[in-house]
From Swiss-Prot:
Residues bound to substrate: 123, 173, 177, 295, 327, 379
MF annotations from Gene Ontology: magnesium ion binding; monooxygenase activity; ribulose-bisphosphate carboxylase activity
Protein name in UniProt: Ribulose bisphosphate carboxylase large chain
EC code(s) of this entry: 4.1.1.39
The record's account of how the chain is modified after translation: The disulfide bond which can form in the large chain dimeric partners within the hexadecamer appears to be associated with oxidative stress and protein turnover.
Organism the protein comes from: Piper cenocladum
Length: 475
């Protein structure tokens, strides 16, 4: 005789294809505190009702498939299925909807961003019933976020390690990004750190190429930062990029960095992958290394308004996977970022509790409980004239990173670093005195330039530089 469960499944099974909305569209569902909630921007194919499209997203990203299967009877679909519980039209857009989906926590492996994304942003994005699909936001419940280590150290521990408080940190990406020998690269690192920067950075493209192997770069950069530390009395760092072709090689590079005694390493978390990133974050926590994260490849995923995934989701994923810094756009400069939206995900990186605020693109209230915060890094086409705006927009808990804005100084790398440090100190002092950086910013920089020839030269070089393109990332 067949087992009872098999008999029941066989008797109750009806083969064929049925509408997703019959099972996965549940507007009466009340979300649980333990559910992972998702807001999808859905563009259905012509003739597909929004309820069917939303239900299809819920089904294909959880327990559903294209036809009824008899093994459905061997489990409890009501316990494990995703549910589309609300749909709202997008204002000003034709045939576009925000579909809200709730996922039971048991669908996801603990501590695995990889597994979470494999379900939520997996095959469903190629589903034929949809013209386009974009994941706008996720609500990560404390019951799930507590299964992650998160950032190796966080903002307060980093400040304590560096002994630097009350101002943004200053950085610089070494340019040209490719082609320098290790010794010349180390020279540029020394000059920038000696001039007053807190950090210098490997470009995301720099791994271990024929013109500069990773071990040589690590050695010369370590020598440069220790020399600059001795001469300035300040703790310095260089983001040594440990990204590699295998996880084993990545960890080997991080181990070598720790043996050199440097304070920080770097990883390209999207091209390297979440599994590799989480492994590196755990190593950094265990061995006292800070972890700088670059977001190379993010625009492939997040730039299109109606398809892909918004960067705020990638930012939340990074906070769970682990990183002490992550690039976040600038609002000003050459790389894209609309102010309210950028500040929305900056808060999601730094703060413990973030209220729902649709004006800033935040679809759900997010409670990170005790997970450490991540410093946002403003980088890309910025220079001394941007310093007041950057200081006002990002506040103290940030890294302001000037690549060309340091190395492009007419007098050289060290004067470029001096110009940026003087501009930052002037802006912080003016802010602390109660001056309005947004309104008086240019005047504050001009006043400081009277006492700093390096800053005056920088102001003259970059006074006409503007990047006047409209941001695409708007609500």
């Amino acid at each position: 005789m067949s087992p009872k469960t098999e008999t029941k499944a066989y008797v109750g099974f009806k083969a064929g294809v049925k509408d997703y909305k019959l099972t996965y569209y549940t507007p009466e569902y009340e979300t649980k505190d333990t559910d992972i909630l998702a807001a999808f921007r859905v563009t259905p194919q012509p003739g597909v009702p929004p309820e069917e499209a939303g239900a299809a997203v819920a089904a294909e990203s959880s327990t559903g498939t294209w036809t009824s299967v008899w093994t459905d009877g061997l489990t409890s679909l009501d316990r494990y299925k995703g549910r589309c519980y609300d749909i709202e039209p997008v204002a000003g857009e034709e045939n576009q909807y925000i579909c809200y989906v709730a996922y039971p926590l048991d669908l996801f492996e603990e501590g695995s961003v990889t597994n979470m994304f494999t379900s939520i942003v997996g095959n469903v994005f190629g589903f034929k019933a949809l013209r386009a699909l974009r994941l706008e936001d996720l609500r990560i419940p404390p019951a799930y976020s507590k299964t992650f280590q998160g950032p190796p150290h966080g903002i307060q521990v980093e400040r304590d390690k560096l002994n630097k408080y009350g101002r943004p940190l200053l950085g610089c990406t070494i340019k040209p990004k490719l082609g320098l020998s290790a010794k010349n690269y180390g020279r540029a690192v020394y000059e920038c750190l000696r001039g007053g920067l807190d950090f210098t950075k490997d470009d995301e493209n720099v791994n271990s190429q024929p013109f500069m192997r990773w071990r040589d770069r690590f050695l010369f950069c370590a020598e440069a930062l220790f020399k600059a530390q001795t001469e300035t009395g300040e703790i310095k760092g260089h983001y040594l990029n440990a990204t590699a072709g295998t996880c084993e090689e990545m960890i080997k590079r991080a181990v070598f960095a720790r043996e050199l005694g440097v304070p920080i390493v770097m990883h390209d978390y999207l091209t390297g992958g979440f599994t590799a990133n989480t492994s590196l974050a755990h190593y950094c926590r265990d061995n006292g290394l800070l972890l700088h994260i670059h977001r190379a490849m993010h625009a492939v995923i997040d730039r299109q308004k109606n398809h892909g995934m918004h960067f705020r989701v990638l930012a939340k994923a990074l906070r769970m996977s682990g990183g002490d810094h992550v690039h976040s756009g600038t609002v000003v400069g050459k790389l894209e970022g609309e102010r309210d939206i950028t500040l929305g995900f900056v808060d999601l990186l730094r703060d413990d509790f973030i209220e729902k605020d649709r004006s800033r693109g935040i679809y759900f209230t997010q409670d990170w409980v005790s997970m450490p915060g991540v410093l946002p890094v403003a980088s890309g086409g910025i220079h001394v004239w941007h310093m007041p705006a950057l200081t006002e927009i990002f506040g103290d808990d940030s890294v302001l990173q000037f690549g060309g804005g340091t190395l492009g100084h007419p007098w050289g790398n060290a004067p470029g670093a001096v110009a940026n440090r003087v501009a930052l100190e002037a802006c912080v002092q003016a802010r602390n005195e109660g001056r309005d950086l947004a309104r008086e910013g240019n005047e504050i920089i001009r006043e400081a330039a009277k006492w700093s020839p390096e800053l005056a030269a920088a102001c003259e070089v970059w006074k006409e530089i503007k990047f006047e393109f409209a941001a695409m990332d708007t609500l």
